């Protein structure tokens, strides 16, 4: 018995008997645990019809506590055995503020999410439109986190980069009977009307993308707005992001922020550009040249509605870059059957007007949230090292300068030069961890190169797996050590052997079974193997 129950009882009786007067009450307390309340309802019509059973049911329901209703909801949802187990764990877990805002039936959904949390999965979420606000642009996000609350300074930029405007946030701690403490953070947000169409489908994509951002598998930037505004997946948005990173390296003056705003203004064009890329490199059914030309013309037709010349130039450059792209590993999967966490693009830079001189014959650009790298090659038979660069903004310029110098040196060794470089984007400050991260980034870079390079088996060229090729056979890829990678050659050769690459431990010079290139005047044994085949 409490005041809230007494007031609700008064309301039920007043409504049942259509009374406008205040319902009077007297409460009697005894030495037992029970209390008795006598109510007096004054009515103007003694002949009013009423249903005693309905009144009793309403009073019984009113007397049930939030915890009682939670138990019933858990039993109905999970069955008797599991429901009772969850009830024992969660019956006293929620704070009063939570119970005042959340219905017991909704708490069951939250409990299901809380039960998914463990040491390997510390974040779960719900993203939904409240029924009572279905006609507005309000959406809700509930984040469930194990052990500790999420810092607003961490999550707010992520949500804003998805184009969401946070208008309210409420944290709740959940203290279970087994001593565990988890947290629920409930956000109210405004979403652009473009993101309201087919909300269920977009919701699933948003949850997957936000989970990837939280785990550092997806970058936290404005390209993520296209998940809600353009209907892209987080991985599809990474296609546009990868090309934006490449644009930066070839000296295009537009900032990434400006490119992001261009596509935010024209999300339907962003979707068409991604579709052009997907159709060109689809493994199952790559589009014909005629179809690709038609898709390109459709994008150009959209430019009639693009008023800003800079936006026009950016969109045209994206089409140029996709046309110039010869191969990608975008549709490859790893040993676990998941799409790879990095994107490799083999590009013919002579087809891109913005590329500075000298223009390589081919280049491979590797992008991931952890590492970016480029491998420039001025011919099919080329040699050169891979450098661990610290010039994140212009490492391609550094590599291009090195390869020009290499070409002069190579006139007495191998006809043309090549050079590669990569930058690590999430380097820790501790020395040992710093080196380890550098090695892991190097591995990603090497895998990115090998993913889209053909192999040779029994003297025959074997095309790269799950790669749609828009160029001739190309199985020539040799690397060497350079600044920062002097001790990495065995790592590269190990990956080459893992890929069953035809050069094996000749892939990278300087390893434990490679040649001493300084003594012998060569950079890579593999380069000579390539010459033999030419």
Model-derived features with residue positions:
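Non-catalytic interaction/regulatory segments
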Residues: 1-164, 168-372, 380-393, 433-437, ...
């Amino acid at each position: 018995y409490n005041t809230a129950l007494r007031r609700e009882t008064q309301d039920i009786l007043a409504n049942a008997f259509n009374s406008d007067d205040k319902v009077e009450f007297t409460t009697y307390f005894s030495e037992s645990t029970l209390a008795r309340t006598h109510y007096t309802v004054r009515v103007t019509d003694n002949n009013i019809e009423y249903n005693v059973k309905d009144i009793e049911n309403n009073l019984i329901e009113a007397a049930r506590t939030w915890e009682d209703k939670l138990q019933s909801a858990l039993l109905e949802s999970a069955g008797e055995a599991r429901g009772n187990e969850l009830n024992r764990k969660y019956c006293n877990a929620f704070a009063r503020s939570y119970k005042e805002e959340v219905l017991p039936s909704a708490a069951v959904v939250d409990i299901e999410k809380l039960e998914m949390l463990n040491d390997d999965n510390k974040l779960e979420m719900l993203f939904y439109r409240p029924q009572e606000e279905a006609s507005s642009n309000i959406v809700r996000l509930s984040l469930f986190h194990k052990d500790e609350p999420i810092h607003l300074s961490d999550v707010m930029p992520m949500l804003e980069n998805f184009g969401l405007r946070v208008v309210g946030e409420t944290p709740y701690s959940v203290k279970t009977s087994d001593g565990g403490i988890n947290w629920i953070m409930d956000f109210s947000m405004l979403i652009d009307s473009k993101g309201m169409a087919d909300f269920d489908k977009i919701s699933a994509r948003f949850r997957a993308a936000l989970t990837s951002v939280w785990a550092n598998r997806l970058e936290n930037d404005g390209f993520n707005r296209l998940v809600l505004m353009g209907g892209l997946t987080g991985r599809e948005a990474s296609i546009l992001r990868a090309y934006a990173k490449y644009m930066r390296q070839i000296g295009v003056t537009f900032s990434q922020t400006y490119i992001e705003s261009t596509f935010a203004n024209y999300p339907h064009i962003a979707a068409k550009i991604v579709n052009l890329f997907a159709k060109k490199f689809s493994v199952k059914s790559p589009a014909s040249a005629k179809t690709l030309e038609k898709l390109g013309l459709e994008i150009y037709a959209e430019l009639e509605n693009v008023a800003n010349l800079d936006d026009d130039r950016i969109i045209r450059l994206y089409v140029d870059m996709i046309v110039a792209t010869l191969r990608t590993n975008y549709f490859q999967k790893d040993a676990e059957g998941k799409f790879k966490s990095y994107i490799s693009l083999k590009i013919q830079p002579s087809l891109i007007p913005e590329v500075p001189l000298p223009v390589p014959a081919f280049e491979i650009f590797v992008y991931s949230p952890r590492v970016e790298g480029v491998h420039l090659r001025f011919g099919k038979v080329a040699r050169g090292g891979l450098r661990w660069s610290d010039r994140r903004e212009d490492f391609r310029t550094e590599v291009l300068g090195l390869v020009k110098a290499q070409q002069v040196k190579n006139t007495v060794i191998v006809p043309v030069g090549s050079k590669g470089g990569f930058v690590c984007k999430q380097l820790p400050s501790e020395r040992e961890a710093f080196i380890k991260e550098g090695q892991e980034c190097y591995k990603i870079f090497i895998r990115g190169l090998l993913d889209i390079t053909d192999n040779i088996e029994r003297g025959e060229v074997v095309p790269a797996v799950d790669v749609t090729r828009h160029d001739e056979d190309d199985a020539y890829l040799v690397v060497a050590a350079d600044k920062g990678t002097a001790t990495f050659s065995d790592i590269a050769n190990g990956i080459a052997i893992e890929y069953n690459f035809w050069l094996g431990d000749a892939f990278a010079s300087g390893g434990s079974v490679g040649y001493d290139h300084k003594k012998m005047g060569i950079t890579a044994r593999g380069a000579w193997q390539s010459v033999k085949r030419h």
